[in-house]
């Protein structure tokens, strides 16, 4: 019964890469070829918050990006809390904007403190590390460089797989 975890974390990876690629391309087009948003200090990135929420509808600090959370996930004794704070921050970044309804409750089904993940925090975090690593290893490429939407295809495939295993048809997830 991990569909909400898999789909939620897959979406988290997607929006992390989406905002990173958008910011990186802007910097690269301006001649800053060595720039990588993922390496930027959070305090510097804060300067772009309002603009990014206006353009993308949400904001994610560099330390909150999927790639950076994955780098340190197996060393984070409070990974469940880290993820909960990140998901709350992503939803909160859209509050009071046109995209608020799109992000409100987006990660509500992704309960990182659920006993479904394990009886103890240590067990839950072990499971979360496995989920993050599994999604990190998915070869989805850069969605902007492809005519095939690998993220969308993976998401759609998983949704239909979960629907069929639940005895539902395609549109009844």
What positions do the PLM features span?
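Non-catalytic, mostly N-terminal accessory regions of nucleic-acid modification and defense proteins
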Residues: 1-173
